[in-house]
């Protein structure tokens, strides 16, 4: 009972906390909208209640944690630049609510386009059996976001989600479980294609958001990213292309003829990636696609 009691606050108390938090957010260059997102998660308040401040008159609101703990986490957001997604433990992505921790990269909105591109790539292909079926790989799955997206658009496919980090795979498995997709996604620990060697030549497609940031660029990233997100998922080596080169080189062995090769990359890498794909000699119909901001962000090709 005491535990529940410590998590109960009056609407007025929470209203006062919210106003103070918004003020401190403004003062420290944190988007004030994060306050309401946080309260939506920990207090179950919807956007309307927050916008109209109708909760101010409620006699009591049960939080997921005591108000003092919430304040401590908010101070970490302000002063340690801890991402709000790690504070609440979830982030929205496509139609999902995805669990995240500091063991995984926070899935970005632009990465959602990989799923749309995969769908379009299979729709325009005349390959038999259809590319929407069979085996698909999400290499470097992290939170499992891409694997979940693929499982949703390809209900007849088996998705193999690979990651080097066992902690990341635990989060990805949790997400698949929460979304009732565990029967369609197989989680495998290992490096890129290695643990899938028994399925060489059988994959309808491979999708990856690999590490693509040059090592020397990492310290220039936002503190939220540099200090809190896993460098294993960010560091792409001297020119940022180590992992992408590997995926270009190795993937033809695993893809079936006509199979899809699709990755996300950094702004400014498109020309080199396109050239690497052409020079490899095992790909055709090589395409570069922009993200929603018009930046050349995705490379798509088919196995010859």
Map each language-model feature to its residues.
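Conserved Class I SAM-dependent methyltransferase catalytic core
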Residues: 238-302
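Mobile active-site "lid"/loop adjacent to the S-adenosyl-L-methionine
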Residues: 212-243
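Conserved hydrophobic residues forming the short capping helix/wall of the S-adenosyl-L-methionine
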Residues: 25, 122, 176, 251, ...
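Conserved SAM/SAH cofactor-binding pocket of Class I
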Residues: 113-220
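Short helix-capping segments at alpha-helix termini
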Residues: 29, 155-156, 177-182, 254, ...
């Amino acid at each position: 009972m005491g535990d529940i009691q410590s998590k109960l606050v009056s609407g007025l108390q929470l209203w006062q906390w919210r106003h103070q938090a918004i003020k401190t957010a403004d003062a420290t260059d944190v988007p004030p909208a994060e306050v309401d997102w946080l309260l939506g998660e920990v207090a179950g308040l919807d956007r309307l209640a927050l916008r109209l401040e109708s909760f101010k008159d409620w006699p009591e609101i049960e939080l997921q944690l005591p108000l003092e703990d919430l304040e401590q986490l908010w101070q970490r957001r302000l002063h340690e630049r801890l991402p709000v997604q790690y504070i609440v433990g979830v982030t929205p992505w496509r139609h999902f609510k995805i669990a995240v921790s500091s063991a995984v990269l926070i899935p970005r909105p632009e990465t959602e386009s990989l799923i749309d591109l995969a769908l379009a790539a299979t729709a325009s292909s005349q390959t038999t059996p259809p590319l929407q079926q069979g085996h698909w790989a999400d290499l470097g799955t992290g939170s499992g976001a891409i694997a979940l997206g693929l499982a949703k658009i390809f209900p007849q496919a088996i998705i193999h989600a690979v990651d080097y980090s066992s902690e990341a795979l635990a989060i990805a498995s949790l997400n698949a479980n929460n979304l009732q997709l565990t029967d369609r996604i197989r989680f495998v620990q290992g490096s890129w294609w290695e643990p899938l060697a028994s399925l060489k030549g059988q994959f309808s497609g491979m999708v990856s958001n690999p590490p693509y940031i040059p090592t020397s660029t990492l310290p220039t990233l936002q503190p939220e990213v540099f200090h809190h997100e896993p460098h294993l998922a960010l560091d792409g080596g001297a020119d940022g292309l180590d992992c992408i080169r590997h995926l270009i080189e190795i993937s033809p062995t695993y893809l079936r003829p006509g199979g899809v090769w699709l990755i996300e990359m950094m702004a400014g890498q498109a020309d080199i990636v396109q050239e690497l794909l052409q020079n490899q000699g095992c790909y055709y119909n090589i395409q570069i696609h922009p993200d929603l901001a018009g930046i050349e962000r995705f490379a798509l090709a088919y196995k010859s």
